[in-house]
Amino acid sequence: MERRGSLWLFSVLCFGIAILYIPILVLIGYSFNASPLVNVWGGFSTTWYSQLWHNRQLLEAAWLSLEVAVSSSTGAVVLGTLAAVALVRFARFPGRLLLTGMVSAPLVMPEIITGITQLLLFVAMMQLLSWPHRGFTTIVISHVTFCTAYVTITVQARLASADRSLEEAAMDLGAHPARAFLEITLPIIAPAIVSSWLLCFTLSLDDLVISSFVSGPGASTLPMVIYSKVKLGVSPDVNALASLIVCAVGVVILSAGWLMGRAERRRRLETQLAEQ
């Protein structure tokens, strides 16, 4: 009975993995399709990869999306980590409940509501301060707003489970609290920070709804360009670009996982040596 249950769970796991990754493999396969029809196989060809470099609209949108994703992920990681430290290390302070609610709100708020409220905010700020102009800046600010919540929740969970006695021991030996945090606590929560950055990068790169509200003329992200092309039919060079992005993201994730695993093994070894 137990073996049958394990086999059933394994089958469900394989089915879920197939649903996730077979469409990606099909997309990569059709990026080498010689036919201009995206769903009709016409032979193997790399034509669409060569034509991709001449599609200025797609390349500019992809570059803008990467700039937005990197900028917003970095900003969200900084703000989210600081918020997580405040919530974990300072159990009681005025406005803690309000801060917790503000951090959690973007997680449950529909994207269309977030987009509308951000648009109204930027319009009001433009009328009062003549800043910011709708475009790259407004997209980054909006993405930082909803990505910070994911960083805070992730880092807060890791920080709450960290052994604070190590940091206290460092301070007892004369280390400044800031130095103790940077050299003791920060390496412990580094995997959570890196994971949060990758999550925010993916969310920002994939966002369509919020970006559509807060973007301006000449600031179309890649999801916006692809969505506009869907109405007329997706060209095969979109498959080529998507394949390149999938491969690049895969390399980044594997590299980050290897680096985090290496750092974790080194930290465990140093801890064992210190205990001996």
Task: Label each region the model flagged.
Residues 1-6, 70-103, 124, 254-261:
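Transmembrane-helix boundary motif in ABC transporter permease subunits
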Residues 5-13, 82-118, 167, 274-275:
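Cytoplasmic-entry segments and transmembrane alpha-helices of multi-pass inner-membrane transporters
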Residues 37-42, 46, 95, 112-146, ...:
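Membrane-interfacial helix termini and adjacent extracytoplasmic/periplasmic loops
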Residues 12-24, 151-156, 162-163, 177-206:
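Transmembrane alpha-helices
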Residues 63, 67-79, 83, 182, ...:
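Hydrophobic alpha-helical transmembrane segments of multipass integral membrane proteins
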Residues 1-56, 60-63, 67, 255-276:
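N-terminal, non-cleaved signal-anchor transmembrane helix
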Residues 2-5, 36, 49-60, 205-258, ...:
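Interhelical loop and adjacent transmembrane-helix boundary motif
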Residues 2-11, 19, 86, 95, ...:
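C-terminal transmembrane helix and the adjacent membrane-cytosol boundary/short C-terminal tail
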